[in-house]
A protein has these predicted regions:
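N-terminal signal peptide c-region/cleavage motif recognized by signal peptidases
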Residues: 5-7
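Structural motif
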Residues: 31, 106-107
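Central antiparallel beta-sheet cores of small beta-barrel/beta-sandwich binding domains
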Residues: 15, 20-92, 98-101
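N-terminal helix-cap/turn-to-beta initiation motif at the start of protein domains
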Residues: 9-17, 121
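Residue-level recognition of beta-strand termini and adjacent short loop/turns
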Residues: 82, 107-109
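Short, exposed beta-strand-loop hairpins at the edges of beta-sheets
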Residues: 100-103, 110-124
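Short beta-strand-to-coil "C-cap" segments at the C-terminal boundary of structured domains/repeats
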Residues: 127-131
Length: 131
């Protein structure tokens, strides 16, 4: 999947809770002058394979695979990178990999999180739940 986006004007502070297309949420917060984010909820709540709460089972680091997915940091050190764009590190819990990533403000209640590897970029739009 190839996704292209250009940074637009800066909107409201992107800190808050954001919902993805599957109903899960992340909590974006300040970490110094940067932005970070952690998983706040997942949907469905239980892993259908195990019947238990989701864990970080795809993590490349085997010692982290049994940790609860809720609370896992998914955005790190996101620094301002032009009008409404923040760039840093993205952890993809579906693949257990870390990539260069961006948080792009699309509007006051909409952001796009995207990551790139080997020149291919993909991402997802999220909607604001709580500021």
């Amino acid at each position: 999947m190839l996704a292209c986006a250009s940074a637009g004007p800066a909107f409201a502070d992107p800190a808050g809770i954001w919902r993805d297309k599957d109903g899960g949420t992340i909590r974006v917060h300040r970490c110094g002058a940067a932005l970070c984010a952690t998983i706040a909820s997942v949907e469905p709540r239980l892993d259908p394979t195990t019947g238990q709460p989701w864990t970080d089972k795809h993590n490349a680091d085997a010692s982290k695979r049994s940790r609860p997915l809720i609370g896992v940091q998914v955005l790190s050190a996101m620094q301002p990178n032009g009008g409404g764009k923040w760039s840093g590190t993205l952890y993809d819990s579906d693949r257990g990999q870390t990539y260069a990533g961006n948080l792009i403000e699309l509007g006051p209640d909409s952001i796009r999180i995207e990551g790139c590897a080997l020149g291919l970029c993909g991402g997802e739009e999220l909607s604001r739940v709580v500021k």
